Swiss-Prot record:
Entry's Gene Ontology cellular component terms: cytoplasm
Pathway terms, separated by semicolons: Porphyrin-containing compound metabolism; protoporphyrin-IX biosynthesis; protoporphyrinogen-IX from coproporphyrinogen-III (O2 route): step 1/1
Keyword field: Cytoplasm, Heme biosynthesis, Metal-binding, Oxidoreductase, Porphyrin biosynthesis
Protein's recorded name: Oxygen-dependent coproporphyrinogen-III oxidase
Gene Ontology BP annotations: protoporphyrinogen IX biosynthetic process
Stretch list, region Important for dimerization: 242-277
Keyword Amino-acid biosynthesis: no
Length: 304
């Protein structure tokens, strides 16, 4: 079957949101997710779940949305002019986890499906998604584990899949105005419809499970690591980069805002607290400097 089964994708994404929320709730051991069901005037809606002030996670948001429209916003047609004049559906699950302990990295993942149709023409559809990790204090074993997990889930789909999507992730989650990466990357893919629907959908499912396999062991390793005000201040400073990326560069944020998405859900990815400091420059031999020197520059973690 090479025609997309939209209702099957929808059911999978709803179940995925349940699975991820259950896993994060168990990892936190304190707070629970609160749910908002919402409708979009132009068509569609979603289910937003947010956990706040837990034992481990300061904030975690897991959002499901399925939206419809008669015409695409500029953010979608800018690099795909053939989509102009088509109606569309977009659905996906997106999540961001902001831990309280600065030694636990922030993580982000999403999987999404998009289809654009018009009478008398074949539908144009694709999957996209991925996951990426944003440490504040880097640990070599965590970075290696994260990327080995990513490579392992890609391997059944071909030898070139991990290096291609790893490179794409490094390129995408990069703050051009700062000339620095947001984190240590992971996987990023878009416009995936080859070789067929079943294979592309299977890869999306593998990425979804791979995120939990990659992230939860890191949370478990670092959640009891002692920390103080110095680490907290650096975490808040680095969260500022997260805000900058999402508001300036992220295509998903722009699409959500330009397409009339629910603003509270679109901006759910924002950290609850962040700060900026003019011309911050960490001491050369400090753990903070090590993040910039040893972790943010793109590298091949599989060779470590």
């Amino acid at each position: 079957m090479d025609q997309p089964d939209i209702e099957h994708i929808n059911a999978y994404l709803l179940a995925l949101q349940e699975t991820i929320c259950a896993a994060l709730t168990a990892a936190d051991g304190g707070a629970v997710f609160h749910e908002d069901l919402w409708q979009r005037d132009e068509g569609g809606g979603g289910r937003t779940r947010v956990l706040r002030q837990g034992r481990v996670f300061e904030q975690a948001g897991v959002n499901f949305s399925r939206v419809y429209g008669g015409a695409l916003p500029a953010s979608a047609t800018a690099h795909r002019p053939e989509l102009a004049g088509r109606s569309y559906q977009a659905m996906g699950v997106s999540l961001v986890v902001h831990p309280e302990n600065p030694y636990i990295p922030t993580s982000h993942a999403n999987v999404r499906f998009f289809i654009a149709e018009k009478p008398g023409a074949e539908p144009i559809w694709w999957f996209g998604g991925g996951f990426d990790l944003t440490p504040f204090y880097g640990f070599h074993e965590d970075a290696v584990h994260w990327h080995r997990t990513a490579q392992a889930l890609c391997q059944p789909f071909g030898d070139t899949v991990y290096p291609r999507y790893k490179r794409w992730c490094d390129d995408y989650f990069f703050l051009k105005h700062r000339n620095e990466a947001r984190g240590i990357g992971g996987l990023f893919f878009d416009d995936l419809s080859a070789p067929n629907f079943n294979e592309a959908f299977a890869f999306c499912r593998a990425v979804s499970q791979g995120y939990l396999d990659a992230y939860l062991p890191i949370v478990e390793r670092r959640k009891s690591h002692p920390w103080g005000e110095r680490e907290r201040q650096f975490q808040l400073y680095r969260r500022g980069r997260y805000v900058e990326f999402n508001l300036v560069w992220d295509r998903g944020t722009l699409f959500g805002l330009q397409s009339g998405g629910r603003t509270e859900s679109v901006l759910m990815s924002m950290p609850p607290l962040a700060r900026w400091q003019y011309h911050y420059d960490p001491a050369h031999d400090s753990p903070e400097a090590a993040l910039y020197r040893d972790f943010l520059p793109a590298r091949d973690w599989l060779k470590e």
